[in-house]
């Protein structure tokens, strides 16, 4: 594999192990990235197994050529939020034995200054997961209303100074448009008074813009519902989150479908009826990276893995 595609997959053994892979199973890697998880899945699959990988990043699609000679593997260019549509097109609804999602931005995307994801590397202010379509971060910042920017920074970045930062961006962009990551990062650093220890002042705003530009949380919601719809009985969900917004969505989804439908107090309903409304069961507790993994890969520090199984009712 070339250096361009080098990437350390987080919680690799735990995430793939959580799929409980069968020799002849059919699995989905909804976030192919550079193929770390897919490679491990293929190594565990037998000759009759199948892996469907998905990614909306054109560079990831290029990286998937490393598996082009493996008849068990296929890659789909698109967002994982549409995974149920892809599965339906293949006639595999109810036959998927496991879905893996590694949420957020990948290391290659962060490390490539030209992608515009990182405030530590100067490059075009882009931030699109699929840089072949959609508006860039620079285009959005050039026209967004102050209220809209403040809402995005607060909602998706949990930024305390959201309104102040939005006002400053609006005031400065009339003189000089924000076209590069350094332009935005420098402004935020300059206007932020109470800086968090060991955290760049632009961290939360960059996260918020990235999530908004790529509709990341909507994609997660759609992917979870889609996975539930296509999983076979005893099929597994194995999902890595990297910040509280992602993990909260995953945690609540698993909890909601593990508890079953809520019914009004006093409504006559049997235990069997309640059980039949339960669609998932959580497998163990949330898994965090070991100290050893964090030492090898600092970006693993904030990762959380949750595993769930589709119930057979």
Curated annotation (Swiss-Prot):
GO terms for molecular function: rRNA (cytosine-N4-)-methyltransferase activity. One of its GO terms (cellular component) is cytoplasm. Its EC number is 2.1.1.199. It is found in: Cytoplasm. Keywords: Cytoplasm, Methyltransferase, rRNA processing, S-adenosyl-L-methionine, Transferase. It catalyses: cytidine(1402) in 16S rRNA + S-adenosyl-L-methionine = N(4)-methylcytidine(1402) in 16S rRNA + S-adenosyl-L-homocysteine + H(+). S-adenosyl-L-methionine binds at residues 35-37, 55, 80, 102, 109. Its main location: cytoplasm. InterPro entries: RsmH, SAM-dep_MeTrfase_MraW_recog, SAM-dependent_MTases_sf. It comes from the Bacteria. It holds the Pfam family Methyltransf_5. One of its GO terms (biological process) is rRNA base methylation. Signal peptide: none annotated. HAMAP family: 16SrRNA_methyltr_H. Belongs to the methyltransferase superfamily. RsmH family. Specifically methylates the N4 position of cytidine in position 1402 (C1402) of 16S rRNA. This is Ribosomal RNA small subunit methyltransferase H. It comes from Shewanella sp. (strain W3-18-1). The gene is rsmH.
């Amino acid at each position: 594999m070339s250096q361009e595609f080098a990437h350390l997959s987080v919680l690799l053994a735990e995430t793939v192990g959580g799929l409980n892979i069968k020799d002849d199973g059919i699995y989905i890697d909804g976030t192919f990235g550079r193929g770390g998880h897919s490679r491990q899945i293929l190594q565990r699959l037998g000759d009759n197994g199948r892996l469907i990988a998905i990614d909306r990043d054109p560079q990831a699609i290029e990286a998937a050529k490393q598996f082009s000679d493996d008849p068990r593997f296929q890659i789909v260019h698109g967002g994982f939020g549409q995974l149920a549509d892809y599965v339906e097109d293949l006639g595999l609804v109810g036959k998927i034995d496991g879905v893996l999602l590694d949420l957020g931005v990948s290391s290659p995307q962060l490390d490539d200054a030209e992608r515009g994801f990182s405030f530590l590397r100067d490059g075009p202010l882009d931030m699109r997961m699929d840089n072949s379509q959609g508006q860039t971060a620079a285009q959005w910042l050039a026209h967004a209303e102050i209220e809209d920017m403040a809402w995005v920074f607060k909602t998706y970045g949990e930024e305390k100074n959201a309104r102040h930062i939005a006002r400053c961006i609006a005031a400065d962009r009339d003189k000089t448009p924000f076209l590069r990551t350094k332009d935005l990062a420098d402004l935020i650093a300059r206007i932020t008074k109470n800086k968090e220890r060991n955290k760049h002042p632009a961290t939360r705003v960059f996260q918020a813009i990235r999530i908004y530009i790529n509709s990341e949380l909507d994609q997660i919601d759609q992917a979870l519902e889609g996975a539930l719809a296509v999983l076979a009985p005893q099929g597994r969900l194995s999902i890595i989150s990297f910040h509280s917004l992602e993990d909260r969505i995953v945690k609540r989804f698993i909890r909601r479908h593990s508890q079953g439908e809520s019914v009004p107090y006093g409504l006559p309903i049997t235990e069997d009826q309640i059980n039949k409304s339960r669609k998932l069961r959580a497998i163990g507790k949330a898994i965090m990276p070991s100290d050893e993994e964090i030492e090898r890969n600092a970006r693993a520090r904030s990762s959380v893995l949750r595993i769930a199984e589709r119930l057979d009712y």
